[in-house]
Amino acid sequence: MNGNRVVVTGLGAVTPVGLDVASSWQAICDGKSGAASIEGFDTDAFSTQFSCSVKNFSTEGYLAPKDSKRMDPFIQFGMVAGIQAIRDSGLEITEANCERIGCAIGSGIGGIGSIERNNELILNAGPRRMSPFFVPGAIINMISGNLSVMYNLQGPNLAIVTACTSGTHNIGMGARLIATGEADAMLVGGAEMATT
């Protein structure tokens, strides 16, 4: 890829082995596994009873409780990692540069847990019981959308969905937008929470 030089200036991570970059990296270096018994639902009927899910996660210090309550966990993970990356970068977003800074964060499956819960709610209690926040709390582009609103990112805003490679494709797209001069900075990545 020719054009402007692309560099990484900030990192964020919410993983099965840590809730930020430092703790995740240390756990990886120490050879720790994120695999553990699945919590949150009965797994007796399933042959697999473990997953590599995020543990002990909280949005405290990142999102208002009212806002995080309306978000599927994958959005919470992506939001927290994105906030960490912005903080780590030291990037100052101003009225002068906000139109040149964008966001590209995707997910392979999005809010599958929210979709399952709302389907059950509709079947058991009827459609009027479904929350009006269901769709914005479960669709894949809401990580990019919410972070763009939070930080006034007015540049390119997208969420590429390509299954397990969604995060990689969003990182690549961000690099391409910078290299071609369509953006000066991009907040990029992926998030997932499919243990349901």
Question: Where do the PLM segments sit?
Answer:
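Structured loops at beta-to-helix junctions and adjacent beta-edge loops in soluble globular domains
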Residues: 11, 106-108
